[in-house]
């Protein structure tokens, strides 16, 4: 189930994004980005619709994923 990011408080959204970024450990290429930059990048993707917040009832957790990969079950 998609969670509308706009309905979350700024603090909650930032905490979810930060948790996601720390969990992912994504490689950002030749130049390492700060945590703040990574959080800002993910937030931009949510705002643009490239990424979505997803609640998994099975795992009882929230994840961020590319909108193109989201398949509602």
UniProtKB/Swiss-Prot annotation:
InterPro entries: UPF0270, YehU-like_sf. SUPFAM superfamilies: YehU-like. It holds the Pfam family UPF0270. It comes from the Bacteria. Belongs to the UPF0270 family. This is UPF0270 protein PMI2817. It comes from Proteus mirabilis (strain HI4320).
